[in-house]
Amino acid sequence: MNKFWIMLSHTYKNKIMAKSFIISTVITVLLVLVVTNLESIISLFQGDDAKEKIAVVDETNELYPVFSKQLKAVDTDGDLDVKLSKQSEDEVTKQVKDESLDGMLIIKRDEKGTISGTYKALTISDESTYQTLQQALTQTKTAVGTAELGVSQETISSLYAPVTVGQKALKEGAKSEEELGQTVGLVYIMLFVIYFSVIMYASMIAMEVATEKSSRVMEILISSMPPIQQMFAKLLGIGLVGITQLAIIIGAGSLSLKLNQKSETASSVGGFLNLTDVSATTVIYAVIFFLLGYFLYATLAAFLGSVVSRIEDVQQTITPMTLLVVAGFMIAMFGLNAPDAGFITVTSFIPFFTPMIMFLRVGMLDIPFWQAAVGIGITLLTIVILAVIGARIYKGGVLIYGNSSAFKAIKQALRLAKN
């Protein structure tokens, strides 16, 4: 058992100190910091001249005051600096061409009273400015039309206000709208964490085994400790590497959100990922299914890596495993909108999909305990089977050198393990 801990510690330390780990962690942390501080970064580069200067040519000589009022309601961030111009259309157009102005809006009204507008700029690639002006002019049209008909603005506002429709689950024990809102953030997080963890760390395990095999170190290791101990020492070692990396990334993100609570980006992200009111049961299930997903695919990756003779062949060999993960993730993404769909229920009992899809159902629905227990049991049984078969393939596979298909290599590994 002492050798097990020595190998686990060796694997963990080697991976933690590796340049690839340090670089990937730093890059990911920087990306998280950029996302959580996006507003501050944008304002830093834009400065005080960030507002777009827009001139309005009001050919009606009466609509600009109403338009200006509606624009203030639409442009809540104050990104546009809009002013009425008394100059002619040609003169203002010249200013736009000279880049004294970013754009111009011409407001017209025909004989029938229909209000229209034309927006001019050097380029029309900035859809946000156009949409803001269009929305303000549309509201101007509504305000002017209703005023001429003698309808008050308050009446119009009440007519256009969206109808509030509450949701109430009638099934006993079903999750309420509030409970779903609280758990959806955790479900999203766990689906992505499981997906990326399996993709990254399972590939790392396969690469680790293939690397040691190519250096002939494996032959010495196999003779010094049981293959199943060796395999799980690597799985746990790299698993701890993953937990360390996730802890650093999540810690950096949480700290950044706390320091930028007033920013709109931080508040929206923090609101979506609000886990304070999530039930303890859901959190426990999240941990269980994360561990199951990791060990399931890590065990599979370990013995796939052991039958590879060249490091260059690792990605090709683990491609079927990667496709399984991608398929499970895509099904889970669809299931977020329809967690009670029949095929979601069926696929949640397929062990390679269970960690993601069963957790989705546990988080979004109030399923019977026996369904979650069966899913966990099937996955555990699959892990045990993969571990037993994998240990034999691992033992024989590390002694295989030469080019052959994965299927032939597995058969040869099982045959060597018996001898």
From Swiss-Prot:
GO cellular component: plasma membrane
Highest taxon of source: Bacteria
Database matches in InterPro entries: ABC-2_transporter_component, ABC2_TM
Location(s), subcellular: Cell membrane
Transmembrane annotation, as ranges: 16-36, 186-206, 235-255, 283-303, 318-338, 340-360, 369-389
Mode of membrane association: Multi-pass membrane protein
Chief location: membrane
An annotated Gene Ontology molecular function: ABC-type transporter activity
This protein's UniProt keywords: Cell membrane, Membrane, Transmembrane, Transmembrane helix
Pfam families xrefs: ABC2_membrane_3 (PF12698)
The UniProt record lists the keyword NADP: no
UniProt similarity note: To M.jannaschii MJ1024.
Protein name: Uncharacterized protein YhaP
Organism: Bacillus subtilis (strain 168)
Lineage start: Bacteria, Bacillati, Bacillota, Bacilli, Bacillales
Gene designation: yhaP
